[in-house]
Amino acid sequence: MKEIIQKTLLKNGLYAGGILAAYFLVLYLTGVNFFTFSFVSFIVEATVVLIFMFMSISQVRKMTEEKKINFGHAIILSGGVMLIGLFCYQAMKLLVLFVIDPAYNEVCIDEIYFKSIQAIKEYPQYADKMGNPEDIKKLLLIENNLMQFAIFLGKSIIVGALVALVAKKKDKPEDSLIAQ
C-alpha cells in the first residue's frame, strides 16, 4: 500500500506541478502581468490541483484489494499532491522572477504600484482602505516570496483533509450496484 501511495502521490503531484509551471511560463512568455491575472491564476491552480487530488484518491482506491481507502491515506495523498503541485508552481515562479528575468518581476510590480498610486489620487476618500502602495515593492524581495512555501504547507493540510473527507465518502457507481 505504501508503494502505491508514494508512486501515485509523486506522479500526480508532478503532473499538477508541471501543468501549473507551464501555465506560469505561458503568462511570462506572453508578457502578461501575472499580478493582474491573480484571480484567473487562482481558478487555474484550484482546478488543476483538485482534479489531481481526487484522481489520486480514486486511483489508489482502485489499486487496493478491498477497493477502499482510509482517511489517513486519503489525506496524505490529497495533501501531498497539492503540496508537490504548488511547490513546483512556486519554484517555477521564483526561477523566472529572480533568476531568469528579474526585470519581468520589476515591470509587473511597478505596473501594480503605479495603478495603486493612481487609484489613491483619484479616490482619496478610500486611501486608508487601499493600504500603503510601498508595501507592493516588498514583493521584489525573495524572502517575501519564499514564505509561500510555508503557506502552501498549511493550505495542503487543510484542503487535503477536506478533499479526503469528500473523496472517502464519495459513493462510486460500481460500489452502489454491488451493494444492491
Residue ranges, per PLM feature:
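Membrane-helix interface/capping segments
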Residues: I57-H73, F98
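Transmembrane alpha-helical insertion/packing segments
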Residues: M1-R61
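Hydrophobic, lipid-facing residues on alpha-helical transmembrane segments of integral membrane proteins
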Residues: L10-V26, T47-V48, I75-A91, A150-V166
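Short, charged juxtamembrane terminal tails flanking transmembrane helices
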Residues: M1-I4, K169-Q180
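Functional transmembrane-helix hotspots
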Residues: A91-Y123
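Individual transmembrane alpha-helix segments
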Residues: P133-G154
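Short helix-capping/hinge motifs at transmembrane helix termini and TM-loop junctions
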Residues: G31-V32, L97-D101, A167-D171
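Low-complexity, acidic polar-rich segments
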Residues: A119-E134
